[in-house]
Amino acid sequence: MIRMDTVTDLSLREIGVAATKVLGRAVEVRAESHIGRDLAVDSLALMNIIMELEDTFDISIPLDRLASVETAGDLSKLINDLRTRA
């Protein structure tokens, strides 16, 4: 059985990879990292990160679900929820 913290770690790592790729700079991502404030991600960059993550995890992230996402942990949880429903 796969532990949930392992899945979350994978999601957080992939969020960091996507953010680094989109932003063109190294990004350290923690569950508590606020996407806008701590990671300095604007709305356009966020959409590009979301597209990278959709490709990585082969999921579609509904825009209405993003409204409640503030931290990398929130985004990781959303990704994991969508992956388990796929």
From Swiss-Prot:
It comes from the Bacteria. GO terms for biological process: sphingolipid metabolic process. The modification O-(pantetheine 4'-phosphoryl)serine is found at residue 43. Disruption phenotype: Deletion mutant cannot form bacterial ceramide. Mutants are impaired in growth at elevated temperatures but are resistant towards the antibiotic polymyxin B. One of its GO terms (cellular component) is membrane. Pfam families: PP-binding. Pathway: Lipid metabolism; sphingolipid metabolism. Residues 6-83 form the Carrier domain. Keywords: Lipid metabolism, Phosphopantetheine, Phosphoprotein. The keyword Iron-sulfur does not apply. The keyword Nucleotide-binding does not apply. InterPro entries: ACP-like_sf, PP-bd_ACP. Involved in de novo bacterial ceramide synthesis. Belongs to the acyl carrier protein (ACP) family. This is Probable acyl carrier protein CCNA_01221. It comes from Caulobacter vibrioides (strain NA1000 / CB15N).
